[in-house]
């Protein structure tokens, strides 16, 4: 085995950073999604920085302490005041064998019933209470998705179908999508996204990541920018505004449903071209150059083939959005083979109470 997992069975001497769990149901033997709920919020972020630093040092031979400004895992607005709770605008549940809504036990298929979900935003919690999600009896195995976006009314899907007022909503115009709004300075970007499609779950994440990406790309007025793994177009619209009338944005996404959302969200943006297909295949078919490349790959990272295709376009800089420190470090090492060095990095605590973090890295040559 490359690694071992262990569970604490007894605490002989508690760390000063150990606190009463903010979510006892996510403790030992409990549900997943809150594995750090017994750790003080500041200590969670310091530990995540240590993990990020260790992966970059081990896989990319980069010392995080050499970067300026100094890298810390940043909390998002409102999180400290809420104690790292009530941030999720999307919550997925499943009914257990007795018909109660709950979540899977950590690294298990067993469903444990819940009475509440403390990471859920206030709007999600209100929706759950209004629809009696945790007190209603469901058919065992029922999938329950609660979505309360920043920008429109909440939506409840039951086994993928709209649910309203205690029953399935069979109206032809029943809502299956939501509207998200991201405010950047004096400009507001509006996105229509499938209710069960991908969108950042933290209420402040879309704005925080987009600001970091725009800071990372710098002045791109008149430039050609590639937006790879572009999803529903979170970065595409702000990048289109940044390149201006003389620039272009090529957005590439492999997921068909995300591309449908992206086409709606990019409607009217004349300088945006959308391509549907695996990123490596689209890049192989399109040999045009790029001034700047933005990548936001899934957890597995971009990988060597995509990195080589990106480097072959000789952009002046690459802005890499990562949700896995090891994948980021590996791809930073691949980019280094083509002369790109890590010049700045920001890390965000988008998932308090869990081991996950998000990073935005800028590489230049």
Give residue spans per PLM region.
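Residue-level signal for inorganic ion chemistry
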Residues: 34, 324, 361
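A polyampholytic, Gly/Pro-enriched intrinsically disordered region
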Residues: 191, 342-343, 365
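Accessory RNA-recognition modules of RNA-modification enzymes
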Residues: 1-295, 300-308, 314
